[in-house]
């Protein structure tokens, strides 16, 4: 009875969290992104793009269709909805936060304006006026912009927003992705050079996408590659269904969520410090994924992977020549056949440096003898993030990450915490499973709890007039969490067991301050752990946000 009650409680908690995430954002209108009221935005747009008109105004607040047999003598204003025109409009069209689709049968005797949207015109349609695509920020003087507008504007000036699509299909890889040239350096591969063909959602009529990479590690003396083929069905974006397959053989790491490959390569090349751990993974996978909206996507797949231990192959670094790289940790070798699934919800305005939006991801993986696998485990990970403005120049970013498992998690699947991006007052991966843990429990650490809170203050809140000071963003942060093995606290191995014992004394925590560039691409963290007064402050330098 107790076990059933705990299962029901766990399910209810998960349901509540996702209801809160999805429901909360659905009730939040797009206008709430801006510090300028919806009424003021509409008034400014009307004055600028319609102005004084003798025609009647027809105003709508939802998706609207002008059918082929309709003739509208007047101006059409659509707020937070899409407009499809098949008939005739004798007047101006203004759509705010929506798309305009003008079909072949349409005739428009006036201007067509889309504010924070797009205009799609079919070849045989007729528009006797101007077509204008613009942004809300263009309606107001610069000093009235939301701070997010200024960040986006500055980034776009230097081409740093090329990976963002106008409609922010955040669950789909649109536009320019990562660089096509790969350059890395680490203690296993030494110098790695390669080329990549990043995945994109492809064009309307090009339903197949080929993606992957090819490169060579000069110290490991081995080629690395991945080649994938995807085919989408039904709807290209909003309700896209996709089938795909890939084959690969490469030096892999699971540490990219802690530190980016670029940061790690720079640290290894210049500072003789390699933070990432590596292993060889080769095999193939099949997957199917379904977009339930432009922000919500589910995915299920099958993997057949072989894992091999990799040794350290170089000790060279440009500086600190007297040091040695640490040895690359061992893993459990073998063939892992698994079924995995994930569902995630993503409304972030920018994946690399988000300043608003939500992110939620629930993932699971199972591997067992029924799949002819050398491993037997189930693993589940839930991650929630929010980026919430609390004022014109203030924002709170939060992350909660929970991991659990059943069976015997191999070392390469065990949970690890400490240092960069996790518990910043502690050593990097200070809390991790190792061969001694494996010998005792026959499993890596199978429980994890991590929380991060950051309070961001924009320098404009002070307005000192000093150029350097006014470009520094101040971030106060608090981290808490730990990893452990369920057999330390209970003789039950179900995924929902092993958490009820937790007290605050079981949680590691730290606090600190960070100084960051306004775009968030450079930051210095100064953190102090809270479990002792003797340990010094920990200082880290980053070229990316921790989450």
Model-derived segments and spans:
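Bacterial N-terminal signal peptides
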Residues: 15-25
């Amino acid at each position: 009875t107790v076990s059933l009650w705990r299962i029901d409680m766990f399910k209810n908690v998960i349901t509540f969290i996702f209801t809160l995430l999805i429901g909360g954002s659905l009730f939040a209108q797009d206008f709430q992104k801006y510090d300028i009221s919806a009424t003021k935005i509409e008034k400014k747009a009307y004055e600028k793009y319609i102005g004084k008109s003798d025609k009647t105004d027809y105003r709508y607040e939802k998706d609207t269709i002008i059918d082929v047999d309709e003739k509208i003598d007047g101006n059409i204003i659509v707020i937070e909805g899409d407009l499809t025109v098949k008939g005739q409009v004798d007047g101006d069209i203004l759509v705010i936060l929506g798309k305009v689709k003008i079909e072949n049968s349409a005739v428009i005797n006036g201007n067509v304006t889309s504010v924070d949207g797009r205009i799609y015109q079919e070849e045989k349609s007729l528009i006797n006026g101007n077509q204008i695509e613009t942004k809300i920020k263009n309606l107001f003087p610069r000093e009235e912009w939301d701070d997010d507008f200024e960040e986006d504007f500055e980034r776009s000036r230097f081409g740093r927003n090329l990976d963002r699509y106008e409609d922010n299909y955040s669950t789909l890889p649109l536009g320019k992705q990562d660089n096509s040239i790969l350059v890395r350096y680490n203690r296993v591969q030494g110098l790695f050079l390669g080329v990549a063909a990043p995945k994109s959602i492809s064009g309307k009529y090009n339903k197949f996408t080929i993606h992957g990479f090819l490169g060579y590690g000069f110290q490991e003396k081995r080629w690395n590659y991945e080649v994938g083929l995807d085919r989408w069905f039904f709807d290209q974006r909003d309700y896209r269904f996709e089938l795909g397959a890939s084959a690969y053989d490469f030096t892999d790491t699971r540490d990219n969520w802690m530190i980016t490959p670029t940061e790690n390569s720079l640290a290894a090349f210049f500072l003789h410090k390699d933070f990432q751990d590596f292993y060889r993974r080769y095999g193939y996978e099949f997957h199917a994924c379904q977009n339930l909206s432009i922000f919500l996507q589910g995915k299920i797949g099958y993997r057949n992977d072989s894992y091999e231990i990799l040794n350290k192959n170089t000790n060279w670094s440009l500086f600190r020549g007297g040091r040695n790289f640490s040895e690359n940790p061992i893993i459990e070798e073998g063939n892992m056949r698994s079924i995995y699934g994930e569902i995630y919800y993503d409304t972030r305005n920018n994946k690399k440096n988000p300043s608003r939006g939500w992110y939620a991801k629930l993932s699971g993986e199972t591997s067992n003898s029924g799949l002819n696998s050398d491993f037997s485990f189930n693993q589940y990970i839930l991650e929630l993030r929010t980026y919430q403005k609390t004022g014109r120049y203030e924002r709170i970013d939060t992350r909660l990450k929970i991991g659990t498992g059943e069976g015997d998690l191999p070392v390469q699947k065990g949970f690890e915490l400490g240092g960069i991006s996790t518990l910043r007052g502690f050593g990097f991966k200070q809390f991790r499973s190792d061969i001694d843990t494996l010998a005792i429990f026959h499993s890596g650490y199978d429980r994890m709890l991590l929380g991060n809170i950051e309070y961001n203050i924009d320098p404009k809140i002070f307005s000192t007039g000093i150029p350097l000071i006014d470009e520094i963003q101040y971030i106060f942060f608090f981290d808490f969490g730990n990893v452990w093995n369920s057999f330390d606290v209970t003789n039950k191995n179900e995924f929902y067991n092993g958490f009820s014992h937790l007290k605050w004394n079981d949680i590691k925590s730290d606090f600190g301050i960070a100084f960051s560039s306004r775009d968030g691409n450079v930051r210095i963290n100064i953190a102090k752990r809270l479990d002792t007064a003797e340990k010094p402050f920990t200082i880290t330098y980053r070229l990316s946000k921790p989450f």
